[in-house]
Amino acid sequence: MVSPVARWRKARGGGRVIPELPSSLVVEDDQIDLWWIDPREIQAPALLAALAGWLSAEEEARRGRFLFERHRHDFLIARGLVRGVLSRYTGVEPARLCFTTGPHGRPELAPELGAAGLRFNLSHTEGRAVLVVASDEVGVDVEASARTGDPVKIAAHYFAAAEVAALDELADDAARRERFFTYWTLKEAYIKARGVGVGLGLDNFWFDLGRCEASDVSAGSPGVDGWSTIAATGEQIRFAPGFADEPSAWFFTKMSFGTGFPGAIAARRLGRAAPTVRARAAALG
């Protein structure tokens, strides 16, 4: 039997949207799949037109509301990444994937797709789009660290006292900026995995950082199967008294997606061993 994805690929004239892989991907309970792309590298008009054909009417309307073309472009590539990758896990053609939202607006696959055990999360900034796929709650964040703003002032307003103190102890601006984005991406990944907004209170939880350096996902050496394994860096979350969560229920790791693009993943563990994170660059075209 020819899979829906294979039929779609044939109809598109054999165009490749992500690297050639088995027609159906499975993410195990102890595994997180991480996909990333630089939207600036995707410029072929025919490919952009094909990706636009995947968008729902609601997505096309959202895309049209961006004032600048570069932001419309980044949105298109990010949605193309989501639809192209998730089609490989669900067996559903990219344009036929349907989404719903949780109580706080987190996108989820629609129940009628029969993929209740599949979770995903997207993060994008100018220059990077990142998608994680897992079997339980998962969140990812990537930031462009060159953006303006005083990290210490932002941290003083939003972060826990322990994190503010740790930033104050650092000797130079570069170190403080790096540490700020480490904290910020970990916090964002956690609240996205929880499916809630910043109303959770970024000062209600903080992180003890691991001793390991963050892996540069963009510099990884893929194995014969095309995946690179990302080493866990050992971050631990701490909660304010009375906060309704348990530190041991969560796995965290920090990483980068090339110079100037720090990131982090948060995933629910539910008593299981720490998951394996494997990464792959998603090639469109």
Predicted regions and their residues:
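Core catalytic alpha/beta fold that binds nucleotide/phospho-ligands
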Residues: V2-G285
